[in-house]
């Protein structure tokens, strides 16, 4: 555990093309281990115990997620939730100090059930309760307070730490399967059994465990999709009175806690109302999760998504496997990741590179993100770099991380520091749709970014994106296509998420993953509309025009990806190939597409065609 918490940052360089840099923080050197048994077992194993492969077990991701949670505990970020966390911690330590002035004795008595070498220790709920109840000695030191103040103080002491600790304990359990990219064979078989039981349809055509039967009758009596279309037509024709009447009718038959159709209608009605009033609350200006959403909740929602939907799992698997095959003989590997965000894609690849015959290559990652609002536009990507660095140190992978936080179309080739002796990979997964196209600017920032990809002259360009047709400049055309697209997604979550205790996470997932984009598509116009998807055939034309040619996805990768979907997920998920694209969808509708590309003409150092 000490090795995970006290990692040297020597040789860890941060370089930001936008000019804002930060130094590694020292307060990440200590924290609380949420997976103690896991780390002990991992420290006893050797990286050479098994042959090199990609995504065989979930230990890399568990380490990575545990690291993120410790960062959440120990580091005061710019988000409001981080400040609230730190306030809760300060209150917790104030309580302990108030219980006894002799901190050494209190520490020794309260650490019988915990590790003594932890700088920030969050005891179990039982320990908290006993310590807080048996506080008579400390209470005698505050007899100048009246009885009412003592009661309020006791309530504060008893409630706040228990809530915080129980939340972290619950999160530790739920995050064990946060990514299904890496699984052991035994875990695969167990997961397959669970999914098979959950996916068996009943006579109503829904999976077992669904609790929305009581709401089906109401949905069948009112055609909510038709009402939404009529409301959108009224909005498009500026008939505010008719649009308001339709909105009232939709709200009477929709709910954020109903079945898939009811939830779709509820959120689309909110988007239509925002378009009418011009008031979007909360404001939607970028694809990032809301600043009021904590990292804890984001991880819970992400865990639920990868547990019920294979999109990210198979795309990350295919991307990592393709990069690994390219890097089998490379001595230096440079990955330029456009849209690195939290870095969930990389733990399994790093683990595989550590087991490569002959040792791992020198790995350099350039993480690129859009700037955050506030005084620290690069804060998120810097934190991702620190976590990846500590993770690489665990597996002895030589690592260097550079970051850039600025609009992608403004990035220059010099900022990326491409070295001729490196094997270079450009990675862009599910993020290019958020770059404006020619309908916003005649120069087409989207084509500018693709041209930058080509100027990098990569050995491999890994690309995945949403297959969507709701990017029309005409509102009604865009609305109808968005209605079809999101109907499939809400139906997918409605079918695959059964447990009632997951409904809260489903609501968060839909709000942050689906509703933000839908709100942008429906309520915004011009440059304010940040979600601009295209079909995979349209992406193909753009990428070919930028100077790339398709790279064949190996049959082995396609076979293993299909096995992942078949064994772990609902039978209505589909995966197929078309003209060097790996396509994924739900009930026959293609939703996501993945492909690999290479430069049509490879350039030498002197920019000569070869």
Swiss-Prot record:
Residues 32-54, 98-159, 186-220 are annotated as: Disordered. It is found in: Nucleus. Residues 222-283 are annotated as: Leucine repeat I (LRI). A motif (VHIID) lies at residues 333-337. GO terms for molecular function: DNA-binding transcription factor activity. Highly expressed in roots and at lower levels in leaves and sepals. Expressed in siliques. Residues 123-137, 209-220 have a biased composition (Polar residues). Residues 383-415 are annotated as: Leucine repeat II (LRII). Residues 215-598 form the GRAS domain. Its main location: nucleus. Keywords: Nucleus, Transcription, Transcription regulation. Belongs to the GRAS family. This is Scarecrow-like protein 11.
């Amino acid at each position: 555990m000490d090795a995970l918490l006290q990692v040297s940052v020597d040789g860890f360089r941060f370089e930001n093309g936008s000019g804002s840099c930060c130094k590694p923080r020292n307060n990440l050197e200590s924290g609380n281990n949420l997976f103690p048994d896991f780390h002990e077992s991992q420290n006893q194993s050797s990286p050479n115990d098994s042959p090199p492969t990609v995504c065989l077990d979930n230990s890399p991701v568990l380490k990575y997620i545990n690291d993120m949670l410790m960062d959440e505990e120990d580091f005061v970020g710019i988000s409001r939730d981080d400040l609230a966390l730190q306030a809760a911690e300060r209150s917790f330590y104030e309580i302990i100090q108030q219980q006894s002035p002799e901190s050494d004795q209190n520490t020794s008595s309260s650490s019988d059930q915990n590790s003594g070498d932890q700088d920030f220790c969050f005891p179990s709920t039982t320990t908290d309760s006993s310590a807080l109840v048996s506080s008579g000695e400390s209470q005698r030191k505050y007899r100048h307070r009246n009885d009412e103040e003592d009661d309020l103080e006791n309530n504060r002491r008893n409630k706040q730490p228990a809530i915080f600790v129980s939340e972290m304990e619950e999160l530790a359990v739920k995050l064990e399967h946060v990514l299904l990219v890496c699984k052991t064979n035994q875990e695969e078989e167990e997961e397959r059994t669970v999914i098979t039981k959950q996916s068996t349809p009943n006579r109503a055509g829904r999976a077992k465990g669904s609790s929305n039967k009581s709401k089906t009758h109401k949905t069948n009596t009112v055609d909510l999709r038709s009402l939404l279309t009529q409301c959108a037509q009224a909005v498009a024709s500026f008939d505010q009175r008719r649009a308001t009447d339709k909105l009232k009718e939709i709200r009477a038959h929709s709910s954020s806690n109903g079945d898939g159709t009811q939830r779709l209608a509820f959120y689309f009605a909110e988007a239509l109302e925002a378009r009418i009033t011009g008031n979007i609350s909360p404001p939607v200006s970028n694809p990032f999760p809301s600043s009021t959403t904590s990292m804890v909740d984001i991880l819970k929602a992400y865990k639920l998504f990868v547990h019920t939907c294979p999109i990210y799992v198979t795309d990350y698997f295919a991307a990592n496997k393709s990069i690994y095959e390219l890097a089998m003989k490379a001595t230096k590997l440079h990955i330029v990741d456009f849209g690195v965000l939290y870095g969930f894609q990389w733990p399994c690849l790093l683990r595989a590179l550590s087991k490569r015959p002959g040792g791992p290559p020198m790995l350099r990652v350039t993480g690129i993100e859009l700037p955050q609002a506030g005084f620290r536009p690069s804060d998120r990507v810097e934190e991702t770099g620190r976590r990846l660095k500590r993770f690489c140190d665990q597996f002895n992978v030589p690592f260097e991380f550079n970051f850039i936080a600025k609009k992608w179309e403004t990035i220059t080739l010099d900022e990326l520091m491409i070295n001729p002796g490196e094997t270079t990979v450009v990675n862009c997964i599910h993020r290019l749709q958020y770059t404006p196209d020619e309908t916003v600017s005649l120069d087409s920032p989207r084509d500018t970014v693709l041209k930058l990809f080509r100027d990098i002259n990569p050995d491999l360009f890994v690309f995945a994106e949403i297959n969507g047709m709701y990017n029309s400049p005409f509102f009604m055309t865009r609305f109808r296509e968005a209605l079809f697209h999101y109907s499939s997604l809400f139906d997918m979550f409605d079918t695959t998420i059964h447990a009632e205790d997951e409904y809260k996470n489903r609501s968060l997932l839909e709000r942050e993953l689906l509703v933000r984009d839908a709100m942008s598509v429906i309520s915004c116009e011009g440059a304010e509309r940040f979600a601009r998807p295209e079909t995979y055939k349209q992406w193909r034309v753009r990428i070919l025009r930028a100077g790339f040619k398709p790279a064949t996805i190996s049959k082995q990768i396609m076979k293993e990806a299909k096995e992942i979907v078949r064994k772990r997920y609902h039978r209505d998920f589909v995966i197929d190939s078309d003209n060097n694209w790996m396509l994924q969808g739900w009930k026959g509708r293609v939703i996501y597409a993945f492909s690999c590309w290479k430069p049509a003409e490879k350039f030498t150092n002197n920019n000569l065609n070869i």
